[in-house]
Amino acid sequence: MTVPIIFGISSTKLTKEEIDLFSEHKAAGFILFSRNIESKKQLLELTSVLKGLYPERKIPIFVDQEGGRIARIKPPIGARLYPSAEHFSNIYNEDRLRAKRELKANYIQLMSELKEFGIDSPCAPVCDLSFAGASDVIGDRSFGNTPEKVVDLCKSAISGIQHSGGLPFIKHIPGHGRAFVDSHFDLPVVDTSLEELEATDFKVFGELIGEKVWAMTAHIVYSSIDPLLPATISKRVVDYIRNNIGFKGKLVSDDLCMYALHGEIGKKRSTLKKVIELAQSNLVWREDYSKSLMELFDINTHQITNLEIIELCKKKLAESKTEFLESLAKVTRMSLDAGCDLALHCSGDIDEMRTICNVNVK
């Protein structure tokens, strides 16, 4: 049975559990991350194995390779580090034609390299506007702060990707730039009027709908359309994307593991994972999280070591997994029922993958 899911996998090669799962539930595609890449030879072998799972059809393979800080393939595996969108935005301010020419050439080379590795899409370009004071989750990934500039540069990026036989992926429809929190961890709410959104953020995507691209949704509440649900799981917003913005191509959810979609259990797991990461570093972090940890553990975390905190957090994560799996099944169903053609699941966690494979869609 084919499932409408693009999956991440756990490591540099498929495990037996993954092979068994993907044999029973045929994936719509795969997405790779740094954890899946250790050498040129290994990467080629992995993409060959993934494509060989379903010889009867073409299986697309994706990777986040926008350029700048979003690059899963780095030298010496990749030929070079590619510039960020902001780099071309700055050139554009001085010389529009040069920026467009260099951006297209950049994506021709980037996509050509990905094709050599058996990868079909860089999950680019980012089409979100930049806004002062917004979360830096977009930041230098944006081509600029005006619709005209962003559309102009995105068309060059799309042309470069297509020139090398790649699949452009415009994101994050209908616009992520105004988010003041990172949707990997929290749920952004945009209260901007529909009239203003249509003249700015939404306009960008409306101008790009004829470019033969796929699109990735934003995990953001747009209160002027649906005050309750983020775009990915909102039928109102997906209908708006289809009927008002006019996008008729493949619509893919952003990663369903992102905690913006999961309410209180998402906030809890987000905090636990951030604390584990910080406790493993040399950064000063306890003051920022002492209240949250007191609520989670009912202890004064200043009195225990980082190692003890890490173990406590790992235990809480394990205890909360069943609740998270229930939430994951729910949002998977909601995203597909809302009108997303495909859902993206990136973690590579086998229990999560089994859960969403068994979701019944209306």
Ranges and model annotations:
Residues M1-I5:
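Extreme N-terminal starter segment of soluble prokaryotic enzymes
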Residues F7-G8, L14, R35-P55, I59, ...:
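Second-shell residues forming the walls of enzyme active-site clefts
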Residues E17-I19:
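Short beta-strand/turn micro-motifs at beta-sheet edges
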Residues L21-F33, F117-G118:
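Catalytic domains of carbohydrate-active enzymes, especially glycoside hydrolases
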Residues S39-E45, Y92-S112, P147-D152, L197-E198:
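Glycine-rich anion/phosphate-binding loops
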Residues K51-L81, N106-S130, V150, I158-P174:
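Glycine-rich, aromatic-flanked loop segments that form ligand/cofactor-binding clefts
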Residues I77-L97, S142-G144:
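A charged helix-plus-loop insertion that forms the helical arch/lid used to bind
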Residues S121-G144, H172-D191:
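Short glycine/serine-rich loop/turn segments
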